[in-house]
Amino acid sequence: MRHTALPRVRSIGAARAASTAAPAPGAARSTAATGGGAAGGPRHVGRRIAVLAACGVLAVGCAEAGTAGTDSAGGNGGASSPVKVGLLYSKTGPLAAYGKQYLEGFKAGLDYATKGTGKVDGHPIEFVEQDDAGDPAKAVSGAKELIGKGYKILAGSTASGVALQVAPFAAQNKVLFISGPAAADKVTALNKYTFRSGRQSYQDTLTAASFVGDAKGRKVTVLAQDSAFGQANVAAVKAVLGKEGATVDAVLAPPSATDLTPFATQAKAAKPDLLFVAWAGETASALWTSLNQQDVFSSTRVVTGLDLAASYPLFGPAGEKISFLNHYFAGAAGTDIEKAMTEAVAKGGGKPDIFTPDGFTAAQMVVHAVEANKGSADDTAALVKALEGWSFDGVKGHLTVRAEDHALLQPMFQVRLTGSGAAAKPTVEKVLPSEQVAPPVLAMVG
């Protein structure tokens, strides 16, 4: 059977040999902070960051024609019938660099979780790639195509806007959906069919809060752009640190501002105990230069998020003076599973980055759910039951799928950069245990 709206079916064996999409030039994202860039140059870097910021992280179908596979995708059609998984992710578009990381992680995780066989109880795990290009409408259209073909498991979502549209659709059709790098807190507890394989914004904010210690009586200033992205960061910091007794104010710059010295001066004059920087756009490098020139780092602790490796040069000489919160960077965890992931990704010519673990974890979750149901994905309620409350060892350490709301409890990192430019390298200063950065339990919405 052939269907041009679907990408080529891939088993784990085929996945190892398949090439993956190269990151979009300059693709980068801001994780509660400034973003980064790739080889596209400063102008391209800035444009990419601006688009990525609009997707909101603390605040993220060009389908390939091919064989669609069997009409029954659940895996109960015989002893060796395949279990089909639909990957909805950004193969192209502004988040393509993250999509590439996710896909590489998923392949490595599938290989690891099935012990190199690509099978669960004799059933091959096959996946198809559906490119959403970061567009919620394309993602929903792709999900509709896959569900119409009988797919019971969907995974992916690089962008929060995509996840928030696909999740309700999956629930309506009683399909398991494992969201990926999309960080929006609203994905947690959205419905009983939706899980996540990455971290969420609240975990970012709690990691930032860890630099303050006891927040009571402390002053925190958020330096951000006066945009939806910046205001969302201000709201998040107030929700976490304000609740703990800190006084939170903000210095907001117009997104069009190019002379950032006045705002760096205002931030210094506020005399905060902690300056939280949430910035995105082509002025990111200029911002860090202004903060450095105004000697802000000598008067307060400055905290921001560390994004993908291509973004490190943006911080310039200021990089060594910043306290970074971080979800993951290559080598951060030091676990045996991280080593296995790194080796598997390297065999395909890649290198792990910030969202490679999200794909790896998604594959672990898929395999566990199918294993618990003896190689079948037909009973979605049973898949959900298998994942709720599951604790397991992952790339970052020990992870738990919280039963009440499907939050993924996981360690987070305090990080420092040493060196600047192309020589900038991150090191872990402190590993924050999952319980320290656990978001509050939410009531399930649907």
Which residues does each PLM region occupy?
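C-terminal motif of bacterial Sec signal peptides marking the signal peptidase cleavage site
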Residues: 58-61
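Periplasmic-binding protein-like
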Residues: 87, 146-158, 178-180, 219-224, ...
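Extracellular/periplasmic periplasmic-binding protein-like sensory domains
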Residues: 290-360, 371-374, 432-445
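Bacterial signal peptide processing site
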Residues: 63-66
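Extracellular/periplasmic Venus flytrap/periplasmic-binding protein
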Residues: 141, 184-186, 192-294, 331-339
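Extracytoplasmic "Venus flytrap"
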Residues: 69-109, 117, 130-137, 159-161, ...
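Solvent-exposed, acidic/polar segments of extracytosolic/periplasmic ligand-binding ectodomains
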Residues: 394-446
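Beta-alpha junction/loop-to-helix N-cap segments that form part of ligand/metal-binding clefts
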Residues: 70-72, 98-102, 112, 116-188, ...
